[in-house]
Amino acid sequence: MFRNLAVIWKGAAGRKLNSLEVHDIMCYIGECVVVGGVRRTSLISLSNHSDERMRHAKMGNWHTENPQRSLANNSICFTDKPDMGAFMREWVSIYESRSGERGVFNREACKRMAPERRDTDHDFGCN
């Protein structure tokens, strides 16, 4: 893990890390979460519609060139309803990736639906 992180940090010397570099760091750390030889990592990366790096994170030969990315599910996070053209471009991108990534998550729809699915009598847990 440390060697992989060092490569990323050295490549970003003098600038901020980009979204894909941060995603890869998260995945490399996730590779270390193993108990009894079983991976115990569950990761999701939410990205903006305009983030081309994350859109293409699981395209091409990623499973051999960047196998750490298999640890995470990647989803686009809409904050409002996209226009039909933007939405269809994202579906085409999902098809062309051949990986089923990026998924689609709508933050506002989730906020509207959450009260119907939450028992407010509980005072524990997350989310």
Give the positions of each predicted feature:
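Conserved catalytic cores of very large enzyme subunits
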Residues: 1-127
